[in-house]
């Protein structure tokens, strides 16, 4: 499904990623572990197309995508990415965070409503649908971000530190949802 080989990235004379290799099959949950500053986020950003590697390759479904921009990896390659930084549209409601992305993807109005309701239910945020995203707790915000990442129905999702700043109970709940996505 996803093969990353020999990724290298330097900023000036500082090499932040040095020959990273990994392979992920459909249904697998794989983590990148290491101390702060080890290059995990840079590796994610190179893998999803936000940052161009100095060397190395990214294959998605057997296709070379190293030179593809992020949007193309998402649309044609089925890759979703959730950054560690907050990515909600703060002034939009929870439901409009989902509906807006679906509209950009060209999904029809009736299907947008159906999928929005489905995602709100799946992530336990239906009661928050009219709330502004800026008013959400850390766990609620993260649920919304993951739901929004799933709007495009990606084949693979890269989650960069998905549990930062979230309480243990919410972490368990989100982990359960993620495990349920493996089907």
Tell me the role of every PLM-derived stretch:
Residues 33-35:
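The feature captures the beta-strand-to-loop junction immediately N-terminal to the Walker
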């Amino acid at each position: 499904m996803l093969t990353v080989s020999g990724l290298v990235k330097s900023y000036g004379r500082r090499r932040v990623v040095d020959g990273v290799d990994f392979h992920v099959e459909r249904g697998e949950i794989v983590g990148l572990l290491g101390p702060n500053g080890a290059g995990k986020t840079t590796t994610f950003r190179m893998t999803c197309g936000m940052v161009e590697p100095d060397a190395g390759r990214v294959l998605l479904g057997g296709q070379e995508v190293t030179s593809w921009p992020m949007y193309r990896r998402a649309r044609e390659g089925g890759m979703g990415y959730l950054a560690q930084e907050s990515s909600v549209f703060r002034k939009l409601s929870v439901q409009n965070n989902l509906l807006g992305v679906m509209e950009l993807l060209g999904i029809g109005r009736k299907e947008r409503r159906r999928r929005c309701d489905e995602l709100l239910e799946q992530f336990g945020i239906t009661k928050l649908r009219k709330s502004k995203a800026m008013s959400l707790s850390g766990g609620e915000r993260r649920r919304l971000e993951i739901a929004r990442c799933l709007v495009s129905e990606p084949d693979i999702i890269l989650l960069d530190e998905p549990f930062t700043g979230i309480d243990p109970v919410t972490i368990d709940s989100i982990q359960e949802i993620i495990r349920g996505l493996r089907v």
